[in-house]
């Protein structure tokens, strides 16, 4: 009798243990409708469905009249619906129907004037995962994870909520969108759910971080956050976003793309040189995942200081944004030859310590995001800790003096636009 009792207990224990073994597939990636890109006359709405389906996009103006439609006729899981014929500086409501599901959101087209106001948010290293994501392939946790019953990572949720409340025109993500290896299985819990509210109303343009490229070279990020049109140029790894008087140049400096050292001959070096030489916008912002200077774990990056910094100085770049270190750092003052260098890696992953550094103007190991706004001839920057505390604030000044003289000699169209804003 005792032997049977122990046998039953052993079988129950073995059965319970089987519930904790990774034998299931990861839950399929699925999202709400989200904005991939918005231009003055068009917008692209993305959607990932759990199973293949057709989809229909309807865009309505303020009076409720239909102004644009688009459709994916063939059943697919990954949808990109492009609405055209929109008007600059307008707000529209959109609806996506895919199978039995309906999604709705708001899109705002940017103004077409060269000095149109623009506001955008920037952050990096937000891809922290909740504890249960490592158990979502077990029989016990698979269906709760698949049905979205489990909570997401708290700091990432808090950042996402504050971004949505601020209502930016778009979000610039500085890389490491998803930890630990940028896999599709972790996008729902680490990105699409925490940022769902802001994604419904503003596109996210993301830099490829080192964790984003650890699996399949970053193809997951490119599939989730690039339009098909942007993939035609540099495979979507490098791109520019232009809004009014601001150009943001997004570049890939990962060692898996073009070699470990950033130098002349690197494909990103060539792309950046072309973009900087052709840009006519008064303010240029360059965004990479990797800091040039650091007062935290990553330290200075010599190849960027030697090969990229001279490019930025030569072309009068005002701001260099990066992530990688999980904290806030600022080096430099606006108005000098070098751009202001900001490290913003406090988007939700575990924070890093900072160390005293005489070169740094601001240091703070806090979860945060950055609010950037161009209006009335000024570009204002503020880093905001979660909860509302202001970490740092400054103005990105227009090129002047010898910097403006260099620009006028090589790019008179840009120099003229700078003069018009003064």
What are these regions (language model features)?
Residues 44, 54-56, 128-134, 214, ...:
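Short, solvent-exposed loop/turn elements at domain surfaces
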Residues 34, 70, 83, 91-114, ...:
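Extended active-site neighborhood of metal-dependent phosphoesterases/phosphodiesterases
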Residues 30-56, 61-63, 71-78, 87-185:
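N-terminal active-site segment of His-dependent metallophosphoesterases
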Residues 29-42, 46-48, 55-56, 241, ...:
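Binuclear metal-dependent phosphoesterase catalytic core
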Residues 120-122, 171-173, 206-207, 286, ...:
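Residue-level marker for buried hydrophobic side chains located in beta-strands
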Residues 125, 175-176, 209-210, 251, ...:
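Active-site glycine-centered loops adjacent to acidic/histidine catalytic or metal-binding residues
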Residues 20-28:
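Proline/serine/threonine-rich low-complexity linkers at boundaries of modular beta-sandwich domains
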Residues 1-14:
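N-terminal Sec-pathway targeting helices
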């Amino acid at each position: 009798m005792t032997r049977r009792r122990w046998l039953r207990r052993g079988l129950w224990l073995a059965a319970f243990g089987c519930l904790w073994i990774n034998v299931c597939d990861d839950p399929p990636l699925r999202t709400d409708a989200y904005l991939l890109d918005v231009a003055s006359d068009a917008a692209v709405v993305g959607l990932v469905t759990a199973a293949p389906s057709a989809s229909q996009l309807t865009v309505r103006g303020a009076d409720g009249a239909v102004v644009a439609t688009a459709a994916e006729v063939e059943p697919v899981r990954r949808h990109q619906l492009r609405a055209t014929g929109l008007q600059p500086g307008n707000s529209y409501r959109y609806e996506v129907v895919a199978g039995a599901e309906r999604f709705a959101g708001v899109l705002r087209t940017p103004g077409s004037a060269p000095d149109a106001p623009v506001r955008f948010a920037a952050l990096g290293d937000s891809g922290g995962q909740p504890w249960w994501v490592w158990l979502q392939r077990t029989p016990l946790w698979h269906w709760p994870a698949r049905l979205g019953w489990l909570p997401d990572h708290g700091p990432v949720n808090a950042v996402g909520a504050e971004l949505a409340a601020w209502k930016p025109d778009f979000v610039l993500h500085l890389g490491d969108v998803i930890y630990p290896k940028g896999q599709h299985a972790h996008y729902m819990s680490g990105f699409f759910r925490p940022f769902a509210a802001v994604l419904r109303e503003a596109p996210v343009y993301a830099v490829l971080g080192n964790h984003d490229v650890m699996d399949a070279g970053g193809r997951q990020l490119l599939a989730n956050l690039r339009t098909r049109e942007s993939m035609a140029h540099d495979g979507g790894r490098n791109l520019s976003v232009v809004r009014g008087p601001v150009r943001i140049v997004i570049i890939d400096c990962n060692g898996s793309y073009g070699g470990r050292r950033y130098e002349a001959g690197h494909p990103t070096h060539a792309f950046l040189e072309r973009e900087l030489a052709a840009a006519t916008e008064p303010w240029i912002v360059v965004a990479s995942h990797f800091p040039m200077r650091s007062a935290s774990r990553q330290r200075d990056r010599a190849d960027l200081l030697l090969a990229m910094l001279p490019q930025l100085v030569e072309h009068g770049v005002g701001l260099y944004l990066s992530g990688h270190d999980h904290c806030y750092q600022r080096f430099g003052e606006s108005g000098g030859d070098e751009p202001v260098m900001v490290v913003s890696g406090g988007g939700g992953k575990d924070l890093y310590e900072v160390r005293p550094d005489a070169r740094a103007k601001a240091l703070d190991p806090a979860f945060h995001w950055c609010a950037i706004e161009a209006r009335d001839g000024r570009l204002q920057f503020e880093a905001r800790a979660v909860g509302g505390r202001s970490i740092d604030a400054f103005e990105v000044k227009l090129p002047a003096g010898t910097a403006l003289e260099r620009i006028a000699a090589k790019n008179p169209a840009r120099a003229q636009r700078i003069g018009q804003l003064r």
